[in-house]
Amino acid sequence: MARYTQRPENALKRANEFIEVGKPLRALDTLQEVFRNKRWNYAYSETVIEPLMFKYLYLCVELKKSHIAKEGLFQYRNMFQLVNVNSLENVIRGYLKMAEEHTEAAQAQSSAAVAVLELDDLDNIATPESILMSAVCGEDAQDRSDRTILLPWVKFLWESYCQCLELLRVNTHCEALYHDIARMAFQFCLKYNRKSEFRRLCDKLRKHLEDICKSSNQTTGVSINKVETQQLCLDTRLYLLDSAIQMELWQEAYKAIEDIHGLMALSKKTPVPKTMANYYQKLAMVFSKAGNQLFHAAALLKLFQLTRELKKNLTKDDLQRMAAHVLLATLSIPLPSAHPEFDRFIEADKSPLEKAQKLAVLLGLPQPPTRVSLIREVVRLNVPQLVSEDFRNLYNWLEIDFNPLNLCKRIQSIVDIIEGGPAESNLLTPYIQSLKDVTIMRLIRQISQVYESIEFKRLLELASFCNIFELEKLLVESVRHNDMQIRIDHQKNSIYFGTDLTESQREYRPDGPSLQSMPSEQIRSQLVNMSTVLTRAVSIVYPNRERDQRAKLRTQMVHHYHEIKDREHQRILQRQKIIEDRKEYIEKQNNAREEEEARRQEEESRKAKLAEQKRLEQEQEERERKRHQNEIQAIREKSLKEKVQQISQTAHGKKMLSKLDEEGIKKLDAEQIAKRENEELQREAKELQSKLKSQEKKVDYFERAKRLEEIPLFEKYLAEKQVKDKEFWEATEKTRIENAIAERKDAVSQQERLKRMYPDRDEYLDALKKERASLYVEKLKKFEIALEVERKKRLADRIVRRREERRQAFLREKEEERLRKEEEIRLAQAAEERAAAEARRLEREAEDEKRRAQYEKQRAKEEEAERKIKEDRERLAREVAVERERSEKERDTWRPRGGDRPSAPAGGAGEWRRAAPPAGERNDRGAERSERGGDRNERGGDRIERGGDRIERGGERAERGGDRDRKDDGGADSSWRVRREPDSQRAAGAKDAGGAPASRDDKWRRGGDRERDRDFRNDGPRRDRDDRDDRDRGGFRRNDGPRRNDEPQRETGGNWRDAPRQSDRDNRRPGGERRDRDGRDVRGDQRGPASKEAGGGGGGGNWRTAPAPRDEKPAAKRDQPQDKENKGGDDGEWTSVKRR
C-alpha cells in the first residue's frame, strides 16, 4: 500500500497546530514530508507552496537545522526557478533575514548577560569564580558569553550564506541575488571579524567563477560572456577587495586584484574611470603593505595619470598633493642592485623576474618597471614642477645635485616638514624611513667618489640618520650586491673605497649625481679613452678626410637612389596595394566571423528554445502523470476510510484505534491493525524491562555522584601531601649541600698539606732516570740491529714481489692483445656480413623495381587493348546495324520469290558467307541469333568491365587462363577463344552453321600441333617470370600463319587477360551467323559437343553459359601432347602471380 501523505494546505494547518502545542520538531517533520514527496511538486502553484515554505524555513531557523533548510531550498528552486523567480528570491531573502535577526538578537542577549553579570554585586565585582575562570582560559566574560550564546547563531548564519550561494551559483535568473548574498556574506565577516570564514568565502567565490568560465552555456547556466554578468562579478570582487583591506587580509586582497584584472581583460568594453581609479588605489595599498616600493610607486603613477587625464574638476591643491605623493613614493624606492640575479641562486617556486612580470601585467605594463624608468616617467609628466618648492628641492638634492657634505642635513629638513605637516600629510609619513635609506646610499656613493678613505666618526657625522650598526649593515649590503668596492678596517676605524684597481666586475652606469668614476672603473675604460683620443688626433692630422668620405658617400647614395627610385616607387605602390588588400581581407574575415558568430548565437538560442520547449512539455507530461497518480491515490484513501469505519464499529477495534492518531490510521490496513494488538502486548513487556533498566541507571548514577563528591577530598589530600613532600625534599637537599661543602674544604686542606713533598718526589725521579740510562742505551742498540735485519728482509721480498708483478702484467697485456685481435676479426666479419646483406637487399629491391616497371608496362598495354576493343565493338555495332538494315531490305525483296538456298561455294570466307539459306529459315535463325547476339554484346561489355580487375585478381584468372593458353595448340597466334575440337564436333558445328567446308584455314584456327612452337609454349616449370610476361604480351607468338579474314593482325597475342574482342566474338554474316570460332570456345573441349539448339556457327555454347569444372579432364586428343607439361608451368606461373 502506498505511503499516506497530506496535501500541502492540510500539512500547513497541521504544522500550525503542532507549533501551538509546543512541538516544533513534529511540525517541521510534517512540512518536510511534503517537500520530500515529489507528488505535490508540480501539482500546485507558488501561491500554495510559498506560505508553506516560509513556515518551513521559520522552523528551521528556530531549531537551527541548516541542513534541513538546505534540502527544502534546493527542492523549491527546482520547482520555481523557471516558473516564478520572484517567489524564489523572496523566500531566500526572507530566510536570510530571519537568520540575521536571530543572530543580532543573540548578540544583544550575550551583551545583556555580561552586563547583568557585571552589575550583579557592586561591592564584590571580582568574584572568586571570575578570577579562576580568567586564570584558566584567558578570556573575559564577554568572550565566554559570546562563545555560549552568539557563536551557534553565527555558525548557523554562515552556513545559510554558503547554502544560498551554492543554490544560486548556476542560475542566470537569480544572478543579481547571488551577488547580493555574496556582499551580505562579506558584511557578515566584517561585522563578526571572521577571517577564516572570509578566506573560505573567497575561495568559494573563486571556484564558482572558474566553474562559470569552464561550463558551457546551458538553459539556466550563467555565461561569463554576458556584459551584465561581467559587471556583476567585477563589482563583487571590488567589494571583496575593500572588505579584505578592512580586515587586513592582504593575501586575499592580492587574489581579488588578480580576479579583477582577469575580469577587466575578459570584458570587451573598457571599465569606467572611477573603477580603474579605485583599482589602482587599492593595488597601490596592497603593494605598500607587501613592502614592494617599486610597484607601489608604479601604481600611484598610473593613478596620477588616470586622474589627471579624466578628472575634469581636479583642483590645483589636489593635483599638488597627488604629485607630491607620487614623487615621494618614487624617490623612496630603494636604489637597484647591480646584480639582482643573485636571487636566482636561492631556491624558490618562481624566479623574481617571473613575479615582477606578473605584477607588471596587473598594472597593464609591457615589462616590469625600474627606478630609473619611473623617475624618467615622472619627469616626462612634469611632476617635479607641480609639487611645492620643498619637494622639488628634494628631487634635485637626490637625483641631480652632488653635495655629499650637506645631503643628510637637507633631507632632514624635508623629513621635519613631513612630520610636522598637517593631517593630510600623514599619507607621506610611511615614506620617511625609505627616504632615509635612499639618502644614506646616495651619501655612500658620493663619498666614494670624493674620498679614498674616511673615518667612521666622520661618516657618522655626515649620516645623521643612522647609528654605526645601521651604517655598517648598509656598507655590507653594498659590497654583497657588488655595487661598490668597500673595505672596513675596524682596527683603524676607517673605510676604504675602490682600492682594487684591477677589479671591475660590471660596467658602472651612475643613475644619480656623479662627480667622477671610481679608480677601478678608470682602469677598465683605459682602452675606450685611448680610442677616443686617437680618433680625435686623426681628425686633427687629416681634417678633410672625413669631409671627402662624406662627399663620396653622398655621391654614391645619390647615384644609387637614381638607379632604384623607379623600382622603389613601384614597390611602395605595390606595398600600398598589398596593405589595402590585406585590410579588405581582414575586413572580410571579420565580417565572416561576425556572421558566423551571429549564426552560432542564433543556433544556440534556437537550440535553447527547443530545449526549453521540450523541458516544458516534459514537465507538463510529468504534471499530468502525477495528477493521474493523485486521483488513483485518492480512490485508495477513500476505500481505506471505509474499511476503518467498519473496524471501528467493534469494541476491540475502538480500543485499538483510540491508541492511534489519524495519520497512523491512514498508514495502516486491517491486517496491520490486527498485528498492532500483538505489538501492544510486546510493548508492555518492553516497558517493564525499561523500568528495570531505569532503576539500574539510578543506582549507577547514585554511585557516580558519590565518587564525584569524593574527588575534591582526594584532591585536597594530594595537595597537602605534595606540600609535605616538597618540604621534605628541601630539607634533604639542604643537608646534602652542607655535606658537599664540608667534603671540599677537607680535600683542599689535604692538598695544602701534601705540597711540601714535591721536592722529594722530583729528586727521587731524577735518581731513578740516571740509574736506568745505561739499560736504555743497550736496548736501543738491540733495536737498531733488529731494524736493519728486518729492512733487508723486506727489501728482498719486495724485489721478488715486483718481478712477479711485472711477469703477470706482461702476461695480462699479451692476453689483452690476443682478445683485441679476435675482436677486430669478429667486427670485420660482422661488417662483411652486413655489407653482403645490404647488397642482397639492394639487389632484391632492384629486382622488385624491375618487376614493378614490367607490371606497369603490361598494364598500360592492356588498357590500350581495352580501348581498342571498345572502339572495335562500337564499330562492329554500327556494322551490325547497317547489315541488319540491308538484311531487312533483302528479306523484303526475296520473300515473295521463295526458293531453295544455293549451295555454299568452296571458296574463302567471303564466298560461303554470301551463300545464304532460304529467306524464311535464315530470317528465323537470324532473329534468334540477333537476340543472342545482343545478349552476347551485353555479356561482352560485362567481360570488359570485369577485365579491368583481372590484374588484381590475377591469382584465380592466371590459374584458369594459363591452363587454357597452354592447352591450346593454336600456335603462336591462337587466342583463348580459338580452341581445338574433335573432328566430329567440328563437323557438327559446321553443319549446324551451314558454313563452308573445312579448308586449310581450319588448321590455322585450331593452331596445329607444331613442334617448333613447343619450346616457346612449354619451357618447363622453371620458366622465368619475365619470359612468361613477354610471352603473355605476344613476344613468343608467331604471326606467320594464315588468318580468317583479311583484317590486319592484332597488336598483341591472345593473352587471357585481354578483354573479349568484338571482332572475335560477334563477326557474323548478315543473317546473324557467328564465326566458326564460337563452336570452338575456350571451354569447348570441356563442355563436350555443342548443342544443336545453339544456332548456326556454334555460337550458343558460350564459355560463360555452362559450368566448366576445373578438375574435369577433357577427352583424349591426339593433338594435345603438351597438357601435362603446361600444367606444371601453370603452377609456377600461379606462384609468380601471387608474389606480385
UniProtKB/Swiss-Prot annotation:
- MF GO annotations: mRNA binding; translation initiation factor activity
- One GO CC annotation, please? eukaryotic translation initiation factor 3 complex, eIF3m
**Any GO BP:** regulation of translational initiation
- Stretches of Basic and acidic residues bias are at 589-624, 830-900, 921-984, 999-1050, 1058-1086, 1109-1130
Specify the signal sequence span: none
Subcellular compartments: Cytoplasm
- Name the Gene3D superfamilies on file: 1.25.40.860, UVR domain (4.10.860.10)
Query: What residue ranges carry the coiled-coil annotation?
Result: none
Q: Which domain of life is it from?
A: Eukaryota
Q: Where is the composition biased (Low complexity)?
A: 987-998
What keywords appear on the UniProt entry?
Answer: Cytoplasm, Initiation factor, Protein biosynthesis, RNA-binding
Region of interest (Disordered), residue spans = 589-632, 830-1140
Residue intervals of the PCI domain: 319-502
What is the annotated role of this protein in its UniProt record?
Answer: RNA-binding component of the eukaryotic translation initiation factor 3 (eIF-3) complex, which is involved in protein synthesis of a specialized repertoire of mRNAs and, together with other initiation factors, stimulates binding of mRNA and methionyl-tRNAi to the 40S ribosome. The eIF-3 complex specifically targets and initiates translation of a subset of mRNAs involved in cell proliferation.
Q: Which family does it belong to?
A: Belongs to the eIF-3 subunit A family.
Protein name (database record): Eukaryotic translation initiation factor 3 subunit A
Question: What organism is listed for this UniProt entry?
Answer: Drosophila ananassae (Fruit fly)
Q: What's the encoding gene here? A: eIF3a
